[in-house]
Amino acid sequence: MKSLNIYRNKFKDFGVSHKSLQWKSKGAAHQRFRQFWAEIDFDNKNVLDVGCGFGELGNFLTKRYKYVTYKGVDIMPEFIENGKKIYPSLDLEVADYFNHPKGELYDTIICSGALNSNLGTEKENRLFRENAIETMFLHTTNLLAFNMSGGHPSLKNSKENNIYYSDSLEILKYCMTLTRRVIFRQNYHPSDFTIFMYNVREK
């Protein structure tokens, strides 16, 4: 699996670092986190963090919200192993969630940074992202929130770059085939966007 190999190679080079997660800096990661805080009240919510890395977002959540129930999953065993050492109170688990989701439903699912890897062709990248979004959305009873590298018009992609820049409007159009209740934000970073998808049953 190409995304797993990308992260594994990064971890070999950088160890427990934001660079292993393909973030330019901790500040860049926190900037994305703040988009979630601005929209979501996590109190009394059952939250799944897909692609949790070392669990830093979970640490923020459980400190900020007294009554949140948090679970983090990541495809990388090395991330989870080290995350449990850094944040022993967090519920962290190794899982290939996009391909093998479990049956549990969550009030809120969040995904920060796990939809950025360059998997090859434009079609391969598009299908990976659409499958991941649909899988997560089908397992939330209320809200899916995710961020992704890209914008509109999208930045130029290259095979040599581990990051793939998606066309944000194409991603938004796909999300709206699953629900019309969406919030789209692209005002906080020139090459990143966040989408909130509400799982509201139409009457």
Predicted regions and their residues:
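Conserved SAM-binding loop of SAM-dependent methyltransferases across substrates and taxa
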Residues: 54-65
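N-terminal, positively charged/glycine-rich alpha-helical extensions of SAM-dependent methyltransferases
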Residues: 1-17
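Conserved alpha-helix/loop element of class I SAM-dependent methyltransferases that forms part
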Residues: 27-43
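Conserved SAM-binding strand-loop segment of SAM-dependent methyltransferases
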Residues: 88-98
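Conserved class I S-adenosyl-L-methionine
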Residues: 44-53
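Conserved SAM-binding loop
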Residues: 83-84
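Conserved SAM/SAH-binding beta-strand->alpha-helix loop
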Residues: 76
